[in-house]
A protein has these predicted regions:
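Cytosolic-biased juxtamembrane loops and peripheral soluble domains of multi-pass membrane proteins
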Residues: 24-42, 66-169
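N-terminal signal-anchor/start-transfer transmembrane helix
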Residues: 12-24
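Long, highly hydrophobic alpha-helical transmembrane signal-anchor segments
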Residues: 43-71
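Short, composition-biased local secondary-structure segments
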Residues: 1-2, 131
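Hydrophobic transmembrane alpha-helical segments in integral membrane proteins
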Residues: 3-14
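Alpha-helical architecture
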Residues: 15-18, 49, 80, 117-118
Length: 169
């Protein structure tokens, strides 16, 4: 995969992320209509900045690297797997899925789909994508920096989400 192919991949993932934001906005409106309460809004801008940095950093760093098929193709497989898992989460949660942490009073905690196996499967997708997407293009610095900062933010995010989910019981 050359620079053009990798740039197309980053553009496709960026487009997918924009679709996610549209779905999230629609779901946020649904949640608010049913009395949804947002938790942990303070860390949301940092998450947006981090994910924007992932896409920009991977695209820029990959221009200085060369594609290594032994690494790049398996990482592309992981990117596809992560996207598949993410959309399985979105479909399973339906209107309760959001890029923000929002709980609707009276809603029940979803325990089907990937949530049967892992309490926070969307974050598994985020971690895998954050490692793999940059490595498709050999952008190991972006992969490393994203992974470290993401680990810090996920500690905060998962704590906030768990506290929010406790309010359902």
């Amino acid at each position: 995969m050359g620079v053009k192919g990798y740039t197309a991949l980053i553009a496709a993932v960026t487009a997918e992320r924009l679709v996610e934001l549209v779905v999230s906005k629609r779901n946020l409106e649904w949640s608010k209509a049913y009395g949804g309460k947002e938790f942990g809004a303070g860390h949301y801008p940092a998450m947006v900045a981090l994910h924007t940095g992932l896409l920009a950093g991977a695209a820029l760093e990959a221009r200085k690297r060369r594609f290594r098929p032994g690494l790049g193709w398996p990482m592309l497989g992981l990117v596809v797997a992560a996207q598949t898992l993410r959309w399985w989460c979105i479909k399973t949660l339906g209107p309760q899925w959001n890029t923000r942490v929002v709980v609707v009073p009276g809603a029940t905690r979803v325990a089907s789909g990937p949530y049967r196996v892992v309490p926070h499967p969307n974050y598994v997708a985020v971690v895998v994508e954050g490692v793999a997407l940059p490595l498709v293009g050999g952008a190991w610095i972006t992969s490393l920096v994203f992974s470290v900062v993401n680990a810090v933010l996920l500690r905060i995010r998962i704590r906030v989400e768990n506290d929010a989910l406790q309010s359902l019981t």
